Amino acid sequence: EIEYNSRDRYNSKLRGGETAVINMAENLANLNHQTCVINNCLKDERINNVNWINIKKIRKEKTRIDCDVAIANADANTLNLVLTKKKFVLSLSIQRFEKFIRKGQLLPFMIHKPKIIVLGKYHYTNRSRIISIFGKETLAYTTDKMFMNETLLDFVPNTQVIFSSRPDRNLDLLLNVWNEKISNKCPNVKLLINPPYTLKEKDKNIVVRRLSDQKDLLNDLKESRAMLIPGHKAELFCLAAEEAKQMCVPIVTYGIGCLYERVADKVTGFIAKNDDEFAKYSLDLINDDGIWKEMRNNLLKDRGKRTWNIVAQDLLEIINK
């Protein structure tokens, strides 16, 4: 487990799940709720009105926290650490029944009978009914406020596009279409991708980003003409795409997994049916200032509308049903 608390908010070691915990906890606290996060933080500490509690200490002392509501982050076993009648599990995967058993979720699930919280339409449809028998609710995430508040460039030149998701999220699909159908038609444009990845001889104009803190990502998105991201069956929300949206970067995708939920086709980006369409739409955004400006303006209209404060309020509605 990652050792973190809210002081690590912009650290490169954190992924979307961890930053979501930080933002959700702090915004629940801002709504005047006593909020505790039990995780692998190094020590017990109160930060921004949130109590961070070391999970190893709780397990060692065999104590249980008394609370009104408990929300387990993907692992129903952590519900053993609390005393409450209202229990939820925030699902971060499709989790087929076989994996559910293998991960040791069946026994605590049957003991605690939690409602499952999923992240969107794709997740809701594909989450097994068998392991959602005590109820299933949908809660859409959002991004950190820094992506909403950053001052944008008035115009982004056509010199850079970006893929800022994990390499195992179908980066190979993107590189195939980039090398075969895109890069030779825009030789002055570089594609930024995330590590780990070893460049090959066939790769053209590809730059592997250095992962430091999220402020570097902020700058890379600010200077990117478009985000090229195929999507993946394991993508349930895709924070990378949402970060691009909040930075008003148009997206080209195949719509795999939840990606069709992040893009309004031909309004804030393009959903391609095949490689030829993916290449065409990418080149349209790179080369046609009119298309790029139209989509950029559409993104600006919705920028900053869904904050973590709103997400926290939506969560409270789910809890109070």
Identify the meaning behind each predicted range:
Residues 98-102, 112-136, 148:
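A short, active-site helix/loop in glycosyltransferases that binds the activated sugar's phosphate group
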Residues 122-123, 138-151, 197-199:
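Short beta-strand->alpha-helix junction loop in the catalytic core
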Residues 154-207:
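Conserved catalytic-core segment of nucleotide-activated headgroup transferases in glycan assembly
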Residues 222-236, 249:
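Acidic donor-binding loop of glycosyltransferase active sites
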Residues 265-276, 284-289:
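Conserved acidic donor-binding segment of nucleotide-sugar-dependent glycosyltransferases
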Residues 273, 290-319:
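A charged, aromatic-enriched C-terminal amphipathic alpha-helix characteristic of glycosyltransferases
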